[in-house]
Regions:
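Extracytoplasmic loops and strand-loop junctions of Gram-negative outer membrane beta-barrel proteins
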Residues: 1, 31-36, 85-92, 157-166, ...
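Transmembrane beta-barrel architecture of outer membranes
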Residues: 1-3, 35-37, 45-49, 175
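Signature of Gram-negative outer-membrane beta-barrel scaffolds
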Residues: 1-11, 35, 133
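Residues within well-ordered beta-strands of beta-sheet-rich folds
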Residues: 5-7, 51, 179
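Membrane-embedded beta-barrel scaffold of Gram-negative outer-membrane proteins
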Residues: 9, 15-25, 41-116, 120-122, ...
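Juxtamembrane/interface motifs at transmembrane-helix termini
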Residues: 37-38, 83-85, 138-139
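Gram-negative outer-membrane beta-barrel transporters
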Residues: 69-71, 93-207
Length: 209
């Protein structure tokens, strides 16, 4: 794994940065006795990020923004299968490739020394970017006549459904929040008045295939 980072500061209060990072998540094995996937390989990711951090208006306004892209190979996902004996097991498999891209924005404003107003917003577009035609984790012909392969909970037609461009599970497309914190000094200490609000977009829970 490696990380390359380039920083540029046009002023004392502003920073631009560009980074490229690689990483991986180790593979493993599935514990289900009737699992169609005894083992799965490691997951690899390459991330690209361009961002800005800056303070303005006599350091009363702070703006942080970034745009990013993650490219996954053999990304880990869950898949449910049914054995020829009728048992159901949940296994981890590696989907060939996926891509996540989006941007984040954070703004913090201090109208008075004891009053802070802030908010953030993020947008994420996470999709599978390569086909998989075999629910058993293999690209190619489904082994319909293999008596040793557990039967899928999905039909053969559903197992052949392409996933290129399908949204990834459990990743909200939009998230945002806002808050206001006012600090009142009193004898012997202080009192904070905090009000916050947050919202998260709907997510997909079902399997990709």
């Amino acid at each position: 794994n490696y990380r390359v980072n380039v920083d540029y500061s046009p002023t004392d209060n502003a920073l631009w940065y560009l980074s490229v990072t690689t990483g991986h998540r180790a593979g493993g094995f599935n514990l289900g006795y009737f699992s169609a996937f005894p083992t799965y390989d490691s997951e690899n990711v390459t991330s690209y990020e361009l961002g800005h951090k800056g303070s303005y208006m006599d350091n009363t306004l702070q703006i942080n923004a970034s745009t990013y892209q993650y490219v996954y190979e053999n990304i880990h996902g869950q898949f449910e299968s049914q054995s020829f004996l009728g048992g159901v097991s949940t296994s981890v498999i590696g989907y060939p490739e996926a891509e996540t891209k989006g941007f984040e924005l954070e703004v913090v404003y201090m109208p008075e020394p004891n009053w802070i107003i802030g908010g953030n917003y993020s947008y994420t577009d996470a999709r599978y970017s390569e086909e998989i035609v075999d629910a058993f984790g293999n690209q190619g012909v489904i082994q319909v006549n293999n008596p040793n392969a557990p039967g899928s909970l999905y039909t053969i037609k559903e197992r052949e459904r392409p996933i290129n461009g399908v949204k990834m599970e459990r990743i909200p497309e939009n998230k945002m929040s806002m808050y206001s914190n006012y600090t009142q000094e009193v004898n012997g200490g202080s009192i904070d008045y905090l009000v916050g609000w947050s919202w998260t977009d709907s997510i997909i829970w079902s399997d990709a295939v």
